[in-house]
Curated annotation (Swiss-Prot):
Residues engaged in binding [4Fe-4S] cluster: C116, C120, C123
Other comment: Reaction proceeds by a ping-pong mechanism involving intermediate methylation of a conserved cysteine residue.
Cross-referenced SUPFAM superfamilies: Radical SAM enzymes (SSF102114)
Entry GO terms, CC: cytoplasm
First-level EC class: transferase
Residues the record lists as binding S-adenosyl-L-methionine: G170, E171, S202, S224, L225, H226, N302
A GO biological-process term: tRNA methylation
EC numbers on record: 2.1.1.192
Gene: rlmN
Protein name: Dual-specificity RNA methyltransferase RlmN
Active site: E96 (proton acceptor), C345 (s-methylcysteine intermediate)
Native species: Hahella chejuensis (strain KCTC 2396)
Family: Belongs to the radical SAM superfamily. RlmN family.
Length: 378
């Protein structure tokens, strides 16, 4: 459970931060990696158990610091193996984290904010409004809790959590410093040792922050596109009015150009019945992404109360996918997981807290006009 704010929470500090911390105590830098091994390789949060540190140092740590994680207030496991946690943070707010097992790998979907300010019209989290950014400790705490649940500490053995995606609650690039620091810990061999190819940060398209991200880290990138043209994306993803599709795709090219290896952008496209799921939209998306090294993740919309939107039919989804596949794209349809535990982002925490305000903020489907050429207006 989150502890006293008077003490420094060492969870979520990257190696450089911890070295600076120990130097401030008059200790050598190597204490940082000692501590990281205890926290992340062994799952130990009690300083008294860290026996390769002197008793005097352990007493000093207890005076000024702590290893504090969020409090799990709800946990559920779906029939398909999907697992979801609702975690309470300092101040009483809650976040959610989802684990999805699939074909020999396990993906942990972590949150970066309490709520979200971008107000994408189809997103459950956005309807809850924005409260605050998560600290790096609160981000890493989600992975720490998952690792503890699975006993997932021995890096030499096959692990349950093999992939991490920042696709939970919030826009990661609006919490830039804490997300980057958390990524450092996730990838550090003295942290969780996650490969940069298996750690993905998703963004709705904050172009300046995306350019900055490429200067400080080399994680994999996903963009929440959801529309093949600006008029429709302005409605679904309002940040598009500030950073239109052309600027976003140019930023994606710049990001790939900064990487030391060849990788593709993951393009996320939520299919919404009667809004962006026609073959016209598929052809438009095909042409839009022609020059971008990418793979496309098609996500049938997961309805939530008062969303005003509907999931497309399976036939419509497969027709959309076929247009892209025939053009040579790797286009996968995300299998709906965890329906029996409200595993779609933002759904369960809203039900547990009973605090959502969806009915006041959604754009009703009947208020969106889509022309035959796929353009939209409200």
């Amino acid at each position: 459970m989150s502890g006293s704010s008077a003490k420094i929470n060492l969870l979520g500090m990257n190696r450089s931060d911890l070295e600076t911390f120990f130097e401030s105590l008059g200790e050598k830098k190597f204490r940082a990696t000692q501590l990281m091994k205890w926290m992340y390789h062994l799952g130990v949060s009690d300083f008294d158990l860290m026996t390769n540190m002197s008793k005097a140092l352990r007493e000093k740590l207890k005076e000024v610091a702590e290893v504090s994680v969020p409090e799990v207030i709800y946990e559920d496991i779906s029939a398909d193996g999907t697992r979801k946690w609702v975690m309470r943070l300092a101040g009483g707010n809650s976040i959610e984290t989802v684990y999805i097992p699939d074909n020999g790998r396990g993906t942990l979907c972590v949150s970066s904010q309490i709520g979200c300010s971008l107000d994408c019209s189809f997103c459950s989290t956005g309807k809850q409004g924005f409260n605050r950014n998560l600290s790096s400790a609160e981000i890493i705490g989600q992975l720490w809790i998952a690792a503890r649940s699975f006993g997932d500490y021995d890096l030499s053995k096959e692990r349950y959590v093999t992939n991490i995606v920042f696709m939970g609650m919030g826009e990661p690039l609006l919490n830039f410093d804490n997300v980057v620091r958390a990524c450092d810990v996730m990838m550090d061999d003295f942290g969780f040792g996650i490969s940069k190819r298996r750690l993905t940060v998703s963004t709705s398209g904050l172009v300046p922050a995306l350019d900055k991200l490429g200067d400080v880290t080399d994680v994999s990138l996903a963009i929440s596109l959801h529309a093949p043209n600006n008029s429709l994306r302005d409605v679904l993803v309002p940040v598009n009015k500030k950073y239109p599709i052309e600027e976003l795709l140019a930023a994606c090219h710049r990001y790939l150009g900064k990487l030391s290896d060849k990788r593709r952008i993951t393009v996320e496209y939520t299919l919404i019945a009667g809004v962006n799921d026609s073959e016209t939209h598929a052809h438009e998306l095909r042409d839009l992404l022609r020059d971008l090294p990418c793979k496309i993740n098609l996500i049938p919309f997961n309805p939530f109360p008062n969303s005003g939107y509907e999931r497309p039919s399976r036939n419509a989804t497969l027709r959309f996918q076929k247009v892209l596949s025939d053009a040579g794209y790797v286009a996968t349809v995300r299998t709906t997981r965890g329906d029996d535990i409200d595993a779609a982002c933002g759904q369960l925490v809203g039900r547990v807290e009973d605090r959502t305000r969806r009915s006041q903020k959604y754009i009703p489907l009947q208020n969106i006009n889509v022309s035959p050429d796929g353009r939209a207006s409200v």
